[in-house]
């Protein structure tokens, strides 16, 4: 960890709406601002029948890959494992395409892993706020900033209660991969966020949370933002139950 100070931010994407692409533009811009504070890279993998996302920033720190994938279901966990293997950093940040976080919170979460205080580290305290369409648009137009959003968070919907585990997290790459990485049995949208935390808990691996909220930009809820069908929903829920019932030795 000491010899490799780079942090890799990895983002799998399937563009299912104009808002999704616009949100990712803003997320990339925000992450690029971290260059002033840490050695970093951003790796984006787009998986779809045809490419729909075009980077707006040309920079040696950003790498984009396109994978042809005609499946209607976006196998996010599979692509995350590929991105983690390709990542150059000893710390990997796994980011959704639509989340914004204050810079200080991201750096706090990185520092917890660097100091050996965590294997998994969240850059927020569990409060996951859904921004309305109007404020999301103001942010993208630069007519509102993160600080102003954070000042009015109590006007926003707290999506998953006060202890969310989705949106963004960082891991010690080698340790996380050693203990399974992402669970590819989750196919499409499902409870993989809860599963990975439960797995860390069973294994006795430390998890850290930075203080402060996460902001989620508006986008339409399309197929890959919800369970694809009843069969997939059942299979994904049963996978979570299976893992949650395991012992450390079984994992």
Identify the function of each model-found stretch.
Residues 1-30:
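N-proximal low-complexity "stem/linker" segments adjacent to membrane-targeting elements
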Residues 6-10, 41, 195:
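Cell-envelope/extracellular polymer assembly enzymes that use nucleotide-activated donors
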Residues 20-23, 163-164, 184-251:
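C-terminal catalytic/acceptor-binding lobe
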Residues 28-69:
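Acidic donor-binding segment of Leloir-type glycosyltransferases
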Residues 70-86:
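Glycine-rich, basic loop-to-helix element that forms the pyrophosphate-binding segment
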Residues 87-90, 181:
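Active-site acidic short loop of glycosyltransferases
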Residues 89-100:
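Short beta-strand-to-loop acidic/aromatic patch adjacent to the donor-nucleotide binding site
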Residues 102-184:
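Conserved catalytic core of nucleotide-sugar-dependent glycosyltransferases
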């Amino acid at each position: 960890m000491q010899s490799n100070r780079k942090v890799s931010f990895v983002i799998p994407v399937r563009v299912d709406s104009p808002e999704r692409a616009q949100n990712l533009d803003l997320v990339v811009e925000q992450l690029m601002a971290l260059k002033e504070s840490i050695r970093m890279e951003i790796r984006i993998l787009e998986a779809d029948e045809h490419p729909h996302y075009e980077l707006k920033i040309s920079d040696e720190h950003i790498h984009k890959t396109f994978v042809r994938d005609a499946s209607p279901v976006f196998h996010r966990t599979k692509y995350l494992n590929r991105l983690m293997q390709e990542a150059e950093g000893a710390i990997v940040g796994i980011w959704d395409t639509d989340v914004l976080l204050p810079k200080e919170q991201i750096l706090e979460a990185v520092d917890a892993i660097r100091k050996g205080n965590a294997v998994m580290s969240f850059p927020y305290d569990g409060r996951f706020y859904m921004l309305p369409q109007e404020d999301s648009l103001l942010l993208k137009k630069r007519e509102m900033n993160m600080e102003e959003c954070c000042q009015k968070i109590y006007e926003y919907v707290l999506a998953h209660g006060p202890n969310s585990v989705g949106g963004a997290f960082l891991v010690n790459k080698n340790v996380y991969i050693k203990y399974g990485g992402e669970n590819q049995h989750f196919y499409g949208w499902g409870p993989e966020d809860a599963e990975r935390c439960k797995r860390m808990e069973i294994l006795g691996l430390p998890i850290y949370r930075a203080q402060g909220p996460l902001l989620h930009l508006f986008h339409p809820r399309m197929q890959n933002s919800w369970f694809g069908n009843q069969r997939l929903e059942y299979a994904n829920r049963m996978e979570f139950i299976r893992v949650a019932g395991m012992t450390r030795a079984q994992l």
